[in-house]
Amino acid sequence: MANSKKQAWFFYTTGLPSDIEIEVDDITFHLHKFPLMSKSKKLHQLITEQEQSKVYSHIKLENFPGGSEIFEMVIKISYGFKVDISVSTAVPLRCAAEYLEMTEEYSPENLISKTEKFLSEFVFTNVQESIKALKACESVSSLAESLCITEQCIDSIVFQASSTDPSSFYGWPINNGGIFTVDRKKQSKDSKTELWFEDLTELSFPIFRRVILSMKSSVLSPEIVERSLLTYAKKHIPGISRSSSASSSSSSSSTTIASENQQRELLETITSDLPLTATTTRSLFGLLRAAIILNASENCRKFLEKKIGSNLEKATLDDLLIPSYSYLNETLYDIDLVERLLRRFLENVAVSSSSLTVVGRLIDGVLGEIASDANLKPEQFYNLAVLLPVQARVYDDGLYRAVDIYFKTHSWILEEEKEKICSVMDCRKLTVEGCTHAAQNERLPLRAVVQVLFLEQLQLRQVITGTLLTEEDGDKTVVDLGRWKEAVKENQVLRLDMDTMRTRVNQLEKECLYLKKVIAKIDKESLLKAKHGAGKWSIGKKFGCKFSAQVCDSQEATMVDRRSRRFLS
C-alpha cells in the first residue's frame, strides 16, 4: 500500500539489536544510539529528551536535506564505514551535516569539515565540478543559500570561466539552427574544460540567470556570456533550431520541454541578457525565428532585428529566408522582415562600401529565391529591389536574373508593372552575358530591350574606339599586345551579338509591315461594306488598332541609318 512504511535494517555489529528508530521520508531506519550521539549534536539532544520522558525511541526527521539516500550515507559515516563522496553528494552531505550539527567542536574530523575540505579541494577548483555542485544545490536550496554554497559555486564558475579563450569559439562549426555545437573530435586535452557550456544547460533557469548576471558584472568576455546564453536557449527552446539533428533530438527527448509561455518568457529573458557586442548573426537569426514562432514581445523582436540589421553583411541567404508564420502573409517567406532588416542596416551611417556590396549581393540572392513565389505581388518585389542604394550593386546581373524569374512566374502582370520593376535595373551594369540574354529576352518590356540594344551598340563603339587609340609620344606608338587581343576577342563577341540583334529587329519590321498590310486590307473591305450599309466603323478603329505607316517607316529608316553608319565606320 502507498501508506505502508518501508524498513531498512542496519546491524553493523553482530548480536547487537537496534535501540532507536529514525524515520526519514517514510523510511524507518533501525539504528544504534551510541554512534549517532557521538557524531551528531542534534540527534544527541533528541535521543536524550526521549530517554528522560521514557518514550520509546522513535525520531522523525522532517525535511531532511537530500532525503533518505543522504541520511543513509550519514549513518555509514557515523558508524565509521568508508564512503566515497562525489560532487553530486558533497553539497547535500554538507547541508545534512549542518542540519544534524555534526561540527568539529562536537567531534573531531566530523562530517562538516570533511565535506568542506572536499568542496574546496575538488569542486571549487574546477568549472565543470562547480556546475555539478551548483546543480546539486537546487535540491537543498534553502540550506545551500544560508551556507553560501550556491554563491561559492557561482563565483567559482565565473572565476574559472575567465581562463577560457574566447577565440576558440570561432573555429567551431555552426548547425542549421544557428547555435554553436561542440566538435569533440577536434578538441585537445587542454580544451576539455570548454564543455562546461553544455553542463550549464542542466541548471534551472533561475540559477542559470544568476550565473549569467554574475558573468556580466565581472570582467568576463562578452563571447563567453553569449555562448552560455545561446547554448542554454538551444537546449530549452526547440524552435531555435530550423532542423533537428539526431543528437539534438535524442538530447531533447531526455529534457523536459517547457510550455509555450515558459519558452517565451525564457527567450525574452535570454534576449535581454545578450551582450551588446560579439553576438553571431546566425545565432541571432535562430532566436528571431523562435521569437516569431512563440509570438514574443515586440521589444524582443525589435531588439533582435536591430542587432541583426547592424551586422547584416555577416548573414547568409539561408538566414534571410525565414518562412511566413503568420496567416496574414500570403507569401512563402517573410518579405517584410527582410525589408525591415535591410532598413536597419542602411540606418547605420558607418556602413563601409565593402559591407554594402556584400549586402547587395545578398538581397539580390533573396530576390532570386522569392521571385518564383506566385503570391508575391509586384509592389513587394519592387519595394525590396529599389531599397538598395545604387552603389550597393557592382553588377546588375543578379537583379536581372531575379527579374527574369519573376516575369516568367508572373506572366499575367501588366506592362506598366513590368516597366516599373525594370526601372530598378541599370542596363549599364549588365555584363556581356547579361546584355546578350536581355537583348533576346521576350519576357522583358519593349522599352527595356531597346535600352539594352542601345547600350550594346554604345559599348561596341567604345571598345572599338578605345582599342584603336594609342599613346602618341612623338617618336612611336606603343600598343599593349595582350590588351589588343582581349579587345579584339570582345569585339568579335559584340559583333555576333549585334548580328543577332539586327536579325531580330528585321523580323519585327517584317511582322509590322505584314500586320499593316493585313489591317489596311481589312479596313478597305470594311469601307466597301459600309457603303452598302454593312457597317459603320472599320475594324481597325473598332478594335483600337492604331498602326501607322510612319512608325514602321521611321524604324526602317533608323535601322538603315544605323547599318550605313556601322559599315562606314
Curated annotation (Swiss-Prot):
Gene3D superfamilies: Potassium Channel Kv1.1, Chain A (3.30.710.10). The modification Phosphotyrosine is found at Y400. Residues 240-259 have a biased composition (Low complexity). SUPFAM superfamilies: POZ domain. The keyword Membrane does not apply. Coiled coil: none annotated. InterPro entries: BTB/POZ_dom, NPH3/RPT2-like, NPH3_dom, SKP1/BTB/POZ_sf. Keywords: Phosphoprotein, Ubl conjugation pathway. Residues 194-459 form the NPH3 domain. GO terms for biological process: protein ubiquitination. Residues 240-261 are annotated as: Disordered. Pathway: Protein modification; protein ubiquitination. The keyword Phosphoprotein applies. Residues 18-87 form the BTB domain. Belongs to the NPH3 family. May act as a substrate-specific adapter of an E3 ubiquitin-protein ligase complex (CUL3-RBX1-BTB) which mediates the ubiquitination and subsequent proteasomal degradation of target proteins. The BTB/POZ domain mediates the interaction with some component of ubiquitin ligase complexes. This is BTB/POZ domain-containing protein At3g50840.
